Amino acid sequence: LTDPSPPLPRRRYTTLPRKPQRKNGREKFDTLLDALDGLLQFRETSEISLSDLSEAAGVPAASVYHFFPNREALFAALMQRHLDSLPDVSAGSSPNWQSRTEHFLDQLQKQLCASESVMKMRFGPAPGWAVRELLLEDRNRLGLRLLDYLDTDFELPASPRWPERFRVALTIAEGIWSGAYGRFGRIDDFNIDEAKRAVIAYLEYFFGERLPLRIREEEEALLD
């Protein structure tokens, strides 16, 4: 399904990283991101400066500023690398949409919690609008992914608003996870379950409790 809603508004920021074209530049760029990932294991995003990164990576400050005009560009580059490396999230094969949604959210939560640096950038205070916009776009992508999974096997009620509502559903889940992370420094089992309950309750308001399975073409041919 395509998303009929208008594109997300872009904030005014002039802080995109400068992506290197040459091999040695790409290697240095990756070294800096690896060093940032290491710093985030024991520091908060607000405690890391470009000079800290220069020292940790053993790279001259001029090279750091060449790639990253400021801190926002730095964190945006690491978040983009994380998003680019995420494996696909599936929804399983349960005969009911609630279990498939739970499976999808379980997989997603485990992926996002596999890295301390990702949790700090995703669930903690966003280090700038560039990262925030990447997260908004990713929630939109994930919402469409879950929608496509369910729409493939279930007869959803007709609505042009499904992309928007699934984006809201993913925002609900991440909001609960973020609250847990802010309070405990991790996402505990209680809030994992609460996120699933909240998303299912939200979607159930539009779906109802049961969705009929979609009849595939080969199955329809057998019925003729």
Where on the chain are the PLM-derived regions?
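Amphipathic alpha-helical packing segments from all-alpha helical-bundle domains
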Residues: E102-D106, K110-C113, W129-E155, P163-R167, ...
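Hydrophobic alpha-helical connector segments
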Residues: A77, S90-A114
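N-terminal, Lys/Arg-enriched amphipathic/low-complexity engagement segments
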Residues: R10-K23, D30-T31
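Generic hydrophobic, amphipathic alpha-helix propensity
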Residues: G25-L36, L53, L78-L86
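C-terminal peripheral helix-coil segments that are non-catalytic and often amphipathic
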Residues: L1-Y13, L144, D148-T152, F166-R167, ...
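Alpha-helical DNA-contacting segments of helix-turn-helix folds
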Residues: L40, F75-H82, D138, L142
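Short linear capping/connector segments at secondary-structure termini
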Residues: A91-S94, M121-A130
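Helix-turn-helix
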Residues: A35, L39-A73, A77
